Amino acid sequence: MSDQFDAKAFLKTVTSQPGVYRMYDAGGTVIYVGKAKDLKKRLSSYFRSNLASRKTEALVAQIQQIDVTVTHTETEALLLEHNYIKLYQPRYNVLLRDDKSYPFIFLSGDTHPRLAMHRGAKHAKGEYFGPFPNGYAVRETLALLQKIFPIRQCENSVYRNRSRPCLQYQIGRCLGPCVEGLVSEEEYAQQVEYVRLFLSGKDDQVLTQLISRMETASQNLEFEEAARIRDQIQAVRRVTEKQFVSNTGDDLDVIGVAFDAGMACVHVLFIRQGKVLGSRSYFPKVPGGTELSEVVETFVGQFYLQGSQMRTLPGEILLDFNLSDKTLLADSLSELAGRKINVQTKPRGDRARYLKLARTNAATALTSKLSQQSTVHQRLTALASVLKLPEVKRMECFDISHTMGEQTVASCVVFDANGPLRAEYRRYNITGITPGDDYAAMNQVLRRRYGKAIDDSKIPDVILIDGGKGQLAQAKNVFAELDVSWDKNHPLLLGVAKGADRKAGLETLFFEPEGEGFSLPPDSPALHVIQHIRDESHDHAIGGHRKKRAKVKNTSSLETIEGVGPKRRQNVVEN
């Protein structure tokens, strides 16, 4: 602990009420956030002679200052704690790296309802089904629903302006409510009701109604209609037979955890109406010496309390470990949801099977992640050997993308010892150059990236320039002219040129623009990591360019005229 921090004097000022505390190091950085039912008692525990773990010892040794926020209740303290963790990202807290909103399937409240994927706040009138683990799961489900229940998935702007049915109607994927006379209101409403029941997990009701309609059609000698309904019944049965369904039909989130080699994986199964909608694995940042129960407890708090605006809370959460604050967490979540939320750690029956499945998936995902990291380490070691460097801890790669010189975008991607560091990927809009001048674009992005102060830990060991000798010459010129405080001679500049037929494995590498290039064998691990970071940079640049091009495509030329505001633009367009 720092000599400048007087723990005894500080503890005399601390209250015994519930609240949240923030610990700072000598640089004024928040290094830990915690909550307590009794602040005085909890903070006193940090300054005993025998501490519980090495992690706590390392934390206390760096404390320079502690700030305290008193709250009315322990529940309020729990919510505030996770808000602070999200805000400050302290290095001694377990940190959930994923904070994306989850997608839902949206059934609109229009006269002829549509199905669509939805993320974010639920403002639009209609029904929301989910959450699903990712966009792919939603799109896959929508494609399946379109085959079984042909209700529209088009945007309202398209729907309102159609005078003839589209291709989806022609291939039997939509009933065509956009054109009068193609489908009756009753038939369309019936298909919408089937979708509603199906997404709610009530497959039996869907099948019962369909079978009844098929028998009625058959009795009325409407054999084509009966055959169509029969095909629909078979499609529903094929889907429902594919997955294990709990008899309870409850909404659950099941959380399993695995830990190995200093890395944790938390796997979440999303179960709605007794069906597994999908799952997702998370790899929270875990400080050394952290107990596994703390990983689970912190993850659950951050997962639900930080993302409460975007996540629908299930009726029950099954956990792999006992929590010290299980009741507090359940009460906080219940208060947030406005209904009772159960947190269970010792399930039986189907629930135990779900927990075992989540645990197995966590272990499998962790093994895969560790294997990937091991591969990256091997490749970086091989690259360091090829480049005659002691080690490669950090690499950055640049690429340029444009269409006929327009909407030029440069990308910078970053790899560290564990592979892609996507949080540090950057795109740069390139302006003020001759259209199509890739050399000027590379010159500009390198000056913007490196012509400023850089923390020592962020100085790359290798900078890859995609484009060969000419682009490498630009990079050399930029670095020769840089006037910066950090060691600009540390990064090794490496040019990468594709082969004559631009096939992977035929790349030529250059240390100097004037020198001879060299190639690596196609099976070289060093070449593989170069190809990986170059492809990431290429994809990142193209992605940025496409977004910029789409934005320009959807922008009126009137918007570029100074002094012409939204109202005047609207008047010009209308008149």
From Swiss-Prot:
Cross-referenced InterPro entries: GIY-YIG_endonuc, GIY-YIG_endonuc_sf, GIY-YIG_UvrC_Cho, UVR_dom, UVR_dom_sf, UvrABC_protein_C, UvrC, UvrC_RNase_H_dom
Domain of life: Bacteria
SMART domains reported in the protein's UniProt record: GIYc
SUPFAM superfamilies attached to this UniProt entry: C-terminal UvrC-binding domain of UvrB, GIY-YIG endonuclease
Pfam families: GIY-YIG, UVR, UvrC_RNaseH, UvrC_RNaseH_dom
Cell compartments where the protein resides: Cytoplasm
Ranges for domain UVR: 204-239
Domain GIY-YIG: 16-94
Major site of localization recorded for this protein: cytoplasm
Keyword terms: Cytoplasm, DNA damage, DNA excision, DNA repair, Excision nuclease, SOS response
Keyword DNA repair among record annotations: yes
Keyword Repeat attached: no
Molecular-function annotations in GO: DNA binding; excinuclease ABC activity
BP terms from Gene Ontology: nucleotide-excision repair; SOS response
Cellular component GO terms, alphabetical: cytoplasm; excinuclease repair complex
Self-association state and partner proteins as the record states: Interacts with UvrB in an incision complex.
Role this protein plays: The UvrABC repair system catalyzes the recognition and processing of DNA lesions. UvrC both incises the 5' and 3' sides of the lesion. The N-terminal half is responsible for the 3' incision and the C-terminal half is responsible for the 5' incision.
Protein family per UniProt: Belongs to the UvrC family.
Protein name: UvrABC system protein C
Organism: Shigella dysenteriae serotype 1 (strain Sd197)
Protein encoded by which gene: uvrC
